[in-house]
């Protein structure tokens, strides 16, 4: 089946590669225009464009899909020439206008990383981890004018592991979802797939802003653990130390039974939310329930570092500033 692929970021590359390796003909890709990145602000192609060019596939990079614009009209003309039977979509990042949806025989088919109608929207993987869901998955559906509301074509399930970060889970879903997308194209081609309307209560995963990633240390420890993993690696869970913003990597929960085995049990059980306790080989932070043990932390202008090394730096500063070297630090 002749298809055009629409996608932009790294997770979309996996699906494109699997489609290229299938018997389907990827006649072209649609992706976002080159973007400026890095300190030099030089132009870089999207990951999807880079892969397409490696395989000699035509690349279309319209700034808009709106009819009546130069880019939008040029895209429509090219689509008419290529005449794809379906346009699979993975994280393309541009609004698909209503008149375009009916152009391919089988429509525009989106790969969404949740079990719809659960977690419609921009950040379904992060939302599933933060909510404490035990399972999620991927869904292929025919795009309509709603927000992830189209008829379902196929689904697959994936277990969320207790230590999964958003990156861990998204990586697994990208590979399994890529296979699902190929299977969906196969089913549309041979007529074995019958679109089904979405059923059940919808939930929504809004686009994540930097402020959303801030850690609330008054929350219970399991909520904080999930919040940090959900925002790792991007945009990165963060907290304030004075006026400095620090990114915090995944933490480990200090279980109540474990407290009795630690040398500073009294100090740890009395930690207030956000209060930091520096020991010889670890850094603990108080929460709304039991403490957490920091794994990695990123001070401003530096790379991620071992939290124990960061804690020793704090101890050194304290010993220079006050007799006895007592470390009194609190995140906010």
UniProtKB/Swiss-Prot annotation:
Signal sequence, start to end: none
Keyword GTP-binding: no
Binding site for (6S)-5,6,7,8-tetrahydrofolate: 114-117
Enzyme Commission no: 2.1.2.9
Pfam family, one: Formyl_trans_C
Residue pairs linked by disulfide bridges in the UniProt entry: none
Entry's Gene Ontology cellular component terms: cytosol
GO terms of molecular function: methionyl-tRNA formyltransferase activity
UniProt cross-references to InterPro entries, sorted A to Z: Fmt, Formyl_trans_C, Formyl_transf_N, Formyl_transf_N_sf, Formyl_transferase-like_C_sf, Met-tRNA-FMT_C, Met-tRNA-FMT_N
Top-level taxon in the UniProt lineage: Bacteria
Keyword Transferase: yes
Swiss-Prot/TrEMBL catalytic activity: L-methionyl-tRNA(fMet) + (6R)-10-formyltetrahydrofolate = N-formyl-L-methionyl-tRNA(fMet) + (6S)-5,6,7,8-tetrahydrofolate + H(+)
Gene3D superfamilies per record: 3.40.50.12230
Keywords: Protein biosynthesis, Transferase
Record-annotated membrane-spanning stretches: none
Described function: Attaches a formyl group to the free amino group of methionyl-tRNA(fMet). The formyl group appears to play a dual role in the initiator identity of N-formylmethionyl-tRNA by promoting its recognition by IF2 and preventing the misappropriation of this tRNA by the elongation apparatus.
Family (UniProt): Belongs to the Fmt family.
Protein name: Methionyl-tRNA formyltransferase
Native species: Corynebacterium aurimucosum (strain ATCC 700975 / DSM 44827 / CIP 107346 / CN-1)
Source species taxonomy: Bacteria, Bacillati, Actinomycetota, Actinomycetes, Mycobacteriales
């Amino acid at each position: 089946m002749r298809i055009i692929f629409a996608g932009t970021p790294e997770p979309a590359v996996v699906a494109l590669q699997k489609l290229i390796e299938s018997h389907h003909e990827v006649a072209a890709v649609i992706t976002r225009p080159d973007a400026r990145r890095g300190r030099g602000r030089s132009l870089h192609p999207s990951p999807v464009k880079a892969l397409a060019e490696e395989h000699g596939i035509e690349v279309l990079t319209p700034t808009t899909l709106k009819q009546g614009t130069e880019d939008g009209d040029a895209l429509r003309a090219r689509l008419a020439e290529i005449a794809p039977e379906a346009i699979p979509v993975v994280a393309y990042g541009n609004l698909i206008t209503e008149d375009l949806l009916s152009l391919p025989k089988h429509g525009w088919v989106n790969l969404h990383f949740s079990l719809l109608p659960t977690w419609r929207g921009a950040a379904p993987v992060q939302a599933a981890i933060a909510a404490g869901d035990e399972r999620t998955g991927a869904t292929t559906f025919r795009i309509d004018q709603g927000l992830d509301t189209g008829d379902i074509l196929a689904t697959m399930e994936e277990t969320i592991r207790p230590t999964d970060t958003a990156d861990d889970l998204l990586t697994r879903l990208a590979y399994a979802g890529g296979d699902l997308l190929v299977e969906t194209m196969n089913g549309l081609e041979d007529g074995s797939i019958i679109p089904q309307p979405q059923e059940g209560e919808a939930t929504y995963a809004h686009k994540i802003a930097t402020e959303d990633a801030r850690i609330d240390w008054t929350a219970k420890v399991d909520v904080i653990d999930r919040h940090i993993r959900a925002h790792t690696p991007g945009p990165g869970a963060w907290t304030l130390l004075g006026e400095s913003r620090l990114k915090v990597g995944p933490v480990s929960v200090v279980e109540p039974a474990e407290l009795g085995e630690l040398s500073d049990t009294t100090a740890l059980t009395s930690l207030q939310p956000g209060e930091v306790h520096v020991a010889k080989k670890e850094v603990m932070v108080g929460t709304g329930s039991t403490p957490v043990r920091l794994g990695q932390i990123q001070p401003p202008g530096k790379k991620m570092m071992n939290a124990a090394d960061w804690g020793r730096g704090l101890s050194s500063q304290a010993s220079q500033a006050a007799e006895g070297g007592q470390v009194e630090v609190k995140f906010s």
